[in-house]
C-alpha cells in the first residue's frame, strides 16, 4: 500500500479537503499511532499498529492525524484540548487515543517476603538490601519480572 496515496484518499473521502504533503512509516514510534509535523507538514505513522489492529483502526488513526493537519493549515486550534479539534475528530469518527499494542503490556517486578510470604508487584526495581517488608520488616527476595 502506498501510504501517501492512502492518506490522500482518506482526506478527500472523510474531510473533503486535499492532503498536499507526504505520509511516511516510522518504525521507531512505540506508543503513538502517528505524528504530525507542522514545520514541513508531513505525517508519520506506526506500521506496527496497522499490522496488529488492521485497516479499519488504522483509518481512524489517519483521521486523527489529518485533523491536526487540516486544522493547523486552516489556522484553527489543532491541539488535543482545543474545541475545534474535538469537534472535527467527532465529526469524522477518528480515534481519540491509539489502541494499546500487544507487546506494550505492563511489566512488573515481583518480590516476596521471606518471613510472612507477602508478595509485592512493583513497576520499578527495589533495592532489597535497603528495603524490607512493610508488614513484618522481613527480608525481601526478588522472584522474577512478569
Swiss-Prot record:
Active-site residues, record numbering mapped to chain: 65
Organism: Streptococcus thermophilus (strain ATCC BAA-250 / LMG 18311)
Signal sequence coordinates: none
Major site of localization recorded for this protein: cytoplasm
Annotated keywords: Cytoplasm, Metal-binding, Zinc
Official protein name in the record: Protein SprT-like
Cellular component aspect of the GO annotation: cytoplasm
GO annotation terms (biological process): response to stress
Top-level taxon of origin: Bacteria
Amino acid at each position: 500500500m502506498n501510504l501517501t496515496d492512502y492518506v490522500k484518499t482518506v482526506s478527500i473521502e472523510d474531510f473533503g479537503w486535499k492532503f498536499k504533503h507526504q505520509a511516511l512509516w516510522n518504525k521507531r514510534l512505540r506508543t503513538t499511532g502517528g505524528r504530525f509535523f507542522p514545520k514541513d507538514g508531513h505525517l508519520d505513522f506506526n506500521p506496527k499498529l496497522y499490522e496488529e489492529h488492521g485497516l479499519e483502526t488504522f483509518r481512524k488513526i489517519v483521521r486523527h492525524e489529518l485533523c491536526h493537519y487540516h486544522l493547523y493549515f486552516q489556522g484553527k486550534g489543532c491541539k488535543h484540548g482545543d474545541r475545534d479539534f474535538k469537534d472535527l475528530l467527532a465529526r469524522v469518527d477518528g480515534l481519540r487515543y491509539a489502541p494499546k499494542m500487544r507487546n506494550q503490556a505492563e511489566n512488573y517486578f515481583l518480590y516476596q517476603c521471606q518471613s510472612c510470604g507477602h508478595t509485592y508487584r512493583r513497576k520499578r526495581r527495589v533495592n532489597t538490601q535497603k528495603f524490607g517488608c512493610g508488614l513484618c520488616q522481613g527480608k525481601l527476595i526478588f522472584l522474577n519480572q512478569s
